[in-house]
């Protein structure tokens, strides 16, 4: 039996990147999956995992729209009966200098990275409270609360907010049997990281990823499956005394005082 056997997990932003990695790890640990995404690609992953014998349901929704989220959660519960674990993973990042960033791009981060998390949590939490049992895993970042990079002001703002939300929910609903913890990844080899690299250097994005890796003590970007294993730990009984925590998985990237050429 896996550490998540018999549990049903709703994972947002699951069609690619970290969300896909979490879905694959959760399936390996025995969870029943509800994969929520705005992209049609979510059906492909659900079909693949289902074809391998995992119980997996895909639901389409825009996390910015509370009515859309409510409808998706209702459809999912018709299939699975309940949601034991929520992984708020859906997120975006667009580079832009603070003074040059449009209100549209600013709100794009706020609407998905903050309001989206708020909406999905609000739709799922009441039934967890009724059962007095639930695990919520938030996807924050080292960016925002710990470090900052030029061009990522809106992203940093949104991810720092998730830390505050995590701690507040952990305190507010601890007596209801709900545990809430955040994951703070550094650079992970995902379509988002590749998009940031293309925005930084359209002519040679791979060189940007190479430089990212050089600045990390472990000299590589994380694999989404590694983040998935941390999420599985936080969603399982193995972390039964953890709530309100920030769990950094960054290969040591936040350790150096400055980037060095090495010795």
Swiss-Prot record:
Active-site residues, record numbering mapped to chain: 155
Signal sequence residues: none
InterPro entries named in the record: NAD(P)-bd_dom_sf, SDR_fam
Record: residues binding NAD(+): 10-32
Name of the top EC class for this enzyme: oxidoreductase
A GO MF label: oxidoreductase activity
Pfam families per record: adh_short_C2
Entry keyword set: Oxidoreductase
Taxonomy, superkingdom: Bacteria
UniProt-listed Enzyme Commission number(s): 1.-.-.-
Residues that bind substrate: 141
Matches recorded under PANTHER family: 3-OXOACYL-[ACYL-CARRIER-PROTEIN] REDUCTASE (PTHR42760:SF133), SHORT-CHAIN DEHYDROGENASES/REDUCTASES FAMILY MEMBER (PTHR42760)
Family statement: Belongs to the short-chain dehydrogenases/reductases (SDR) family.
Matches recorded under NCBIfam families: PRK07231.1, PRK08226.1
UniProt name for this protein: Oxidoreductase UcpA
Organism taxonomic ancestry: Bacteria, Pseudomonadati, Pseudomonadota, Gammaproteobacteria, Enterobacterales
Primary gene name: ucpA
């Amino acid at each position: 039996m896996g550490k998540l056997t018999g549990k049903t997990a709703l994972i947002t932003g699951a069609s690619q990147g970290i969300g896909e990695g979490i879905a694959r790890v959760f399936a390996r640990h025995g969870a029943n999956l509800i994969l929520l995404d705005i992209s049609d690609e979510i059906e492909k992953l659900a079909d693949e995992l289902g074809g391998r014998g995992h119980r997996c349901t895909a639901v389409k929704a825009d996390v910015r729209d509370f009515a859309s989220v409510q409808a998706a959660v209702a459809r999912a519960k018709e299939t699975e009966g309940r949601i034991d674990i929520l992984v708020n993973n859906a997120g975006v990042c667009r580079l832009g200098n603070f003074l040059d960033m449009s209100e549209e791009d600013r709100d794009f981060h706020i609407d998905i990275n903050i309001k989206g998390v708020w909406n999905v949590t609000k739709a799922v939490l009441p039934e967890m409270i009724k059962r007095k049992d639930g695990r919520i895993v938030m996807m924050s970042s080292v960016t925002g609360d710990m470090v900052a990079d030029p061009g990522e002001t809106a992203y940093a703002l949104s991810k720092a907010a998730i830390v505050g939300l995590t701690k507040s929910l952990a305190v507010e609903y601890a007596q209801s049997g709900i545990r809430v913890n955040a994951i703070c990844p550094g650079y992970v080899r995902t379509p988002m990281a590749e998009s940031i690299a293309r925005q930084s250097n359209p002519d040679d994005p791979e060189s940007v990823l190479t430089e990212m890796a050089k600045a990390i003590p472990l000299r590589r970007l994380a694999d989404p499956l590694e983040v998935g294993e941390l999420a599985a730990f936080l969603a399982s009984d193995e972390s039964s005394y953890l709530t309100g925590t920030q769990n950094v998985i960054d290969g040591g990237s936040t350790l150096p005082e400055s980037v060095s050429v090495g010795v």
